[in-house]
Amino acid sequence: MIELNKKHYEYEGSIPDYFEKVVLEENNLEPPGKKSLGDAYLDERTAVDVKTINVNGDFHMGNLASQDKIRKWLEDKQNSLMFFFIEYEEDCGVVAINSTKLKHIEEIHPDCLQISAQGLGVMQLKNWDKVEFISKMNRDEWFKDVYAPLLKEFISKEEKKLEKLRLVYDSYKD
């Protein structure tokens, strides 16, 4: 279990970076390597990524992680990926914690996820304000019913963009 010890924090620098450090320190967790999927590990098989949400902010669509990293990590059924969501309000260098939630990726409602065009695709929350959680899905079901359809939709969009780009390229040939 991951928790925050206080309701208010004075911070310096970026709030997401600050809370990644706070979560590690307050829960006696070791930082992972630079290329790791999560910001912390509960054990060698449970990656936890810290996600901060400013409830007074205008933009609430958060990147979760590269879809490729997620797939590679979760293909090993012994591995788990969790997100520690921290909802907060900020005022003059002080952050007030509204709520925290520790959830497996398989607990995020499928309608709340998308894969967007960054690199090989990044899995995102469509809108934190409308995110819903469900009972944890079986891993095989999650891959079949959530991941595969999202990836298919992403690939289709990318193919359409590339086809338009190909037409531009073809107009300059010859």
For the regions a language model picked out, list residue spans one by one.
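Nucleic-acid endonuclease domains
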Residues: 1-174
